[in-house]
Amino acid sequence: MTEATHVTKATHGIKATHVLKPGEPVTLPPAGNISFEIETGQRLRLAQPEGEQVADLISFNRDDVRELLSMHSSRAVNLNWKLTAPHLLYTNRTREMWKIEEDLTAENYCGGGYCSEHLNIARYGAPGTSAPNCQSNLEAAIRGYGMDRWNFNIDACFNVFMTVAYDENGVWEIRPPKGKPGDYITMLALLPQIVAISNCPILFNACNNFRLKPLTVEILA
């Protein structure tokens, strides 16, 4: 496994290289992003030191990046749209990719999608222009692997710790996340993968309860 990872502070445009070693958690700053590799059989832990912070996660088969995480496949195979432990997550080729082993918050959005400049403008008008967003964060994260925006899509994105509600009329609402300080999710890698995570920078809605907070990322020893 390549230990070098790529961490970017999206709010300042500063890029630095970190080393993600098993057993040594890395702090992902508010609005930041990270990319790294994980081997089959290793476990990824994503934690909320302060709670109420959403992460957008995408991942690729390291041996063929055309195969990537799929929320559609994951919902269809599990026959469930509230994916948490002990569910499996699947690729766009419907192969097992992750097993969720622990999930203290037990609240994730599996509909696919991420905030983007175009979406922010459509929803919030001019203030959305050039505002930090998960699409640009994820693109920045994977750039070091020779990939760009066109290597992933909204179906690939697992919105970890995100709370979304539907009412009886079909109204879709983003609500404040339920994560408490110290909550985490642990996922077992079932393929060798390239992983990218955006610490969601959205402040226009309740996704992060209107305050950006750090996350910690760790490959367990």
List where the protein language model places each region.
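Acidic, Ser/Thr/Pro
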Residues: 2-221
